[in-house]
Amino acid sequence: MENLTEIESTMESLTEMESERVEQGTDKEIGSGEKRQDDVKETENENSGERVGEEAPVREHEDSPCLIVIEEGTSLASLEEVTNADDLPKIDDEKNSQFETSPHPSPSPSVALDTEEGLINPTAEDTVEENIVSSEVSSDILKDDGDAVEVDRDTAEVQEETANIPESKLSEDTGSPHHHADILMVQEKAAEEHDMIASGDHEEFPVNPDNKHSEENQSPHHHANNVMEQDQAAEEREIISPGEHKEIPANPDTKVVEENNDRIDEGEANNLNLAGDGSGAVDHDYLTKTELDKVLEVPGSETISKLEDRPSEHLSETSMNVEKELEMPAVEILPDNDKNSDVLAVGVSGDSDNVVSVLPASQTSSDRDEGMITVDAEPTEDMKLDVPDSKLVTDTTVDSTNNKDAHVEANTERQDNSSALVLNDANNESAPVKRVPGPYVASSNIKSEARGSGDLNNGVHKIVRTPPVFDGTMRAKRSFLLDDASDGNESGTEEDQSAFMKELDSFFRERNMDFKPPKFYGEGLNCLKLWRAVTRLGGYDKVTGSKLWRQVGESFRPPKTCTTVSWTFRGFYEKALLEYERHKVSEGELQIPLPLELEPMNIDNQASGSGRARRDAASRAMQGWHSQRLNGNGEVSDPAIKDKNLVLHQKREKQIGTTPGLLKRKRAAEHGAKNAIHVSKSMLDVTVVDVGPPADWVKINVQRTQDCFEVYALVPGLVREEVRVQSDPAGRLVISGEPENPMNPWGATPFKKVVSLPTRIDPHHTSAVVTLNGQLFVRVPLEQLE
């Protein structure tokens, strides 16, 4: 009660001082009062649409031409006396000085008394709720009274002027229990909202941009309000973003009416404007930036994820005038208080997509008019990304063509379309930041610092994608093999020749083999040219079978005194390049067509004498029998050589004359020809079947005479000990071969062929002969009938 008594005495003294000032300034404010009254009504209409989640504004009294409020300390009985009075225009100026303006909420905090006197110091949200409750109480009292209060224009102007005191408190009947309950509810709600502000989850209420303040030097109450406003504004700035924001200047629409500058100087007025407590209009973009910056500055891992948890109506409060919002700069660059601190610049565009760009603290953006941020960064080889504590899965895409742009997309389990990390190269200054809605980042340890050396921050994880390096094998593919089709350029450059020799040296060293570069007439041989010449002709086997070594040797322009060109260059290739060729073919790096004829594939240097003799014998055996030739239809025709000899003998007989010896030869030849023609008719009954893997390289031909079957077979590379012949009386002849060395140079493999003869045979008198040339002759006599 003592506090209430002191309050009433203070209010009476203030009322007297205000009434004196009002009487002096009434004539001056008549013209401006009308304009301000219209501004108050327009502000009420605008603010009623901006409030989200608040109670509906209290409607005006039907019979009242202006807004009616009551003074603090005025009871219901006194109000009835004033209402029932006949002389309404003569309302006391002392009471008019305490009238409030409109029932719409004012965002400025109401600080009428100090907290030391026992009352709670409410915040900006407290004032909003308190104004709404007070307006409802005032409206209920006026409705119960039922009488309209009419005030003439002069008195209305005085009320309008005195209502502009920013920190005046809505007066209610202090003795009413209803009022006391309202005060308790307001205090509890203020405490809850104060906790919400401290936790960073409160809503920002837009400030009326048309508020006008009338300041006076004679009101100690007003001076106290200014001091409390500054203290409370400082506390709000510390809650929202401690030490990170610029002082936002007041909007040009704010007007401060100062009549006397004796007690309140210009500095206090500037502090009132800079306090940001409702004394001036604040830009909607600033509110949006303030909300997002508060979320971004929460310490720990909640730095960016707070954006996702905020409801959508927060942004809707600040988007009343979208066109005006789009005209403002979309990005605010905050000052860097510390060169080592990281600044996250947030841009809010018209499509409500948030783009979070990582901007080093030492850099600022000059593209405010374009609504974009150009981030300077080093090339991607030096780019480092520090993500130590998150569930972040980073997918880095590096453009290999220019190796400049790197887009880092961060993927987490929580998906959201609000933000994406974008890094642009410093060389592409004119390129805008890509605004791609991407996955949400749940970590706060994503930093990008600018250093004097040009590197980004010294993070742990370094994302670098280096181009593939060609090793020796790939280089051999490119320069040693792929250029072999170009005629006239088989020699290659000196660098290619040196690289190829190094390749050969490493190849032999890996296999513990000696490699001596060949020399031709005292000079080093161009092995690269020899390699390309042979591989272009089809490889070693093809060149050997086609007898193209002389052609290969002639490309080196040997002297005319060299009479062994073919043998010399063939030896060079066998010693230096043959093993290398076999390796390339086995690895699939060199494609050489298989030879059409079965030719020797390799030569052992250790057994050059016997091996070459055996190889030559096999080659001659493959050329076919001189006595017989098998046609494509399976018939056996007369051998060309015998026919040729027969013709020669006949010519000689005509020239020389008939002699007994020539007649014998002639008869024998004629008999053989007739016998061969006779046997050819029965060859259709002979079948040859492979048992096991097919061996097409083994050729078998069968002829029938009067008393036996003659079987001619080609088994190149096999000797007598490696060939086996079996027969049975039913007419089956089995020819099998088993080479001693499976890795023989002729490619001979184990085989087994069954020849089915049309008649029964005598297996006890069957004989076989194998020559050194790989020819097999088997004589199978017919079964003798007794």
UniProtKB/Swiss-Prot annotation:
It comes from Arabidopsis thaliana (Mouse-ear cress). InterPro entries: A-crystallin/Hsp20_dom, ARI3A/B/C, ARID_dom, ARID_dom_sf, HSP20-like_chaperone. This is AT-rich interactive domain-containing protein 3. Its main location: nucleus. The gene is ARID3. Residues 1-16, 130-139 have a biased composition (Low complexity). Residues 686-786 form the sHSP domain. PROSITE patterns: ARID, SHSP. GO terms for molecular function: DNA binding; DNA-binding transcription factor activity. Residues 494-585 form the ARID domain. Belongs to the small heat shock protein (HSP20) family. Gene3D superfamilies: 2.60.40.790, ARID DNA-binding domain. It is found in: Nucleus. The keyword Transcription applies. Keywords: DNA-binding, Nucleus, Transcription, Transcription regulation. One of its GO terms (biological process) is regulation of transcription by RNA polymerase II. One of its GO terms (cellular component) is protein-containing complex. The keyword Transcription regulation applies. It comes from the Eukaryota. Residues 18-64, 87-97, 141-156, 169-182, 199-219, 234-248, 402-416 have a biased composition (Basic and acidic residues). Residues 1-182, 199-251, 395-420, 606-638 are annotated as: Disordered.
